C-alpha cells in the first residue's frame, strides 16, 4: 500500500486518520505543523501527501506550493480541511493539490479518494513510460 505523509495540527484528527489508514494497510508518517512536514519531505519520499490548510508555521497551501516548486508532481497531494467554500477549493487546487476534501469527512471517502489519486498517478506513470520508453 501507500507511504503517506499526513500534516495535520489537530492531534485527535491526525490520530483518527492515522489509525484508519493503517487499518487499510498504508504506512503513515504524521507531522503536526507545516514546518515539520517540509523538513521531513527534504529527506524522505512519499507516495501521497495529505495536508490540512490551517496550521501553524507553514500552512497547507504554502506547503503544497513549496513541495510542487521543489519536487514537481512526483507525489499527489490531497488537501483535507474545514475550509469548504468554492474559493477555498480553488485556492487549494491552484496551489497544486490533486484533490480536496472538507471536514467533517468519512474514512471510506478519504480512502476512496486516496485510491483514486494513486490510480491517476500510476496511470500517468504508465502513459509516460509508454510514450518515452
Q: Where do the PLM segments sit?
A:
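Short, Lys/Arg-enriched segments at the junction into DNA-binding effector domains
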Residues: 3, 116-133
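Conserved acidic carboxylate
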Residues: 8
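The feature encodes the CheY-like receiver
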Residues: 14, 56, 85, 103
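Short hydrophobic/Thr-rich beta-strand motif most characteristic of the beta2 strand and flanking loop
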Residues: 25-32, 40
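The short loop immediately C-terminal to the conserved phospho-acceptor aspartate in CheY-like receiver
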Residues: 49, 53-54, 83
Amino acid at each position: 500500500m501507500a507511504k503517506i505523509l499526513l500534516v495535520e495540527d489537530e492531534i485527535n484528527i491526525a490520530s483518527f486518520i492515522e489509525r484508519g489508514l493503517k487499518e487499510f494497510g498504508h504506512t503513515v508518517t504524521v507531522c503536526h505543523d507545516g514546518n515539520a512536514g517540509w523538513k521531513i519531505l527534504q529527506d524522505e519520499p512519499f507516495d501521497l501527501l495529505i495536508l490540512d490548510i490551517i496550521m501553524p508555521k507553514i500552512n497547507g497551501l504554502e506547503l503544497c506550493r513549496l513541495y510542487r516548486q521543489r519536487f514537481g508532481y512526483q507525489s499527489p497531494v490531497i488537501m483535507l480541511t474545514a475550509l469548504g467554500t468554492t474559493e477555498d477549493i480553488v485556492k487549494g487546487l491552484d496551489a497544486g493539490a490533486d484533490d480536496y476534501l472538507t471536514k467533517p469527512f468519512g474514512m471510506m471517502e478519504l480512502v476512496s479518494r486516496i485510491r483514486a489519486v494513486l490510480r491517476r498517478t500510476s496511470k500517468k506513470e504508465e502513459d509516460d513510460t509508454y510514450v518515452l520508453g
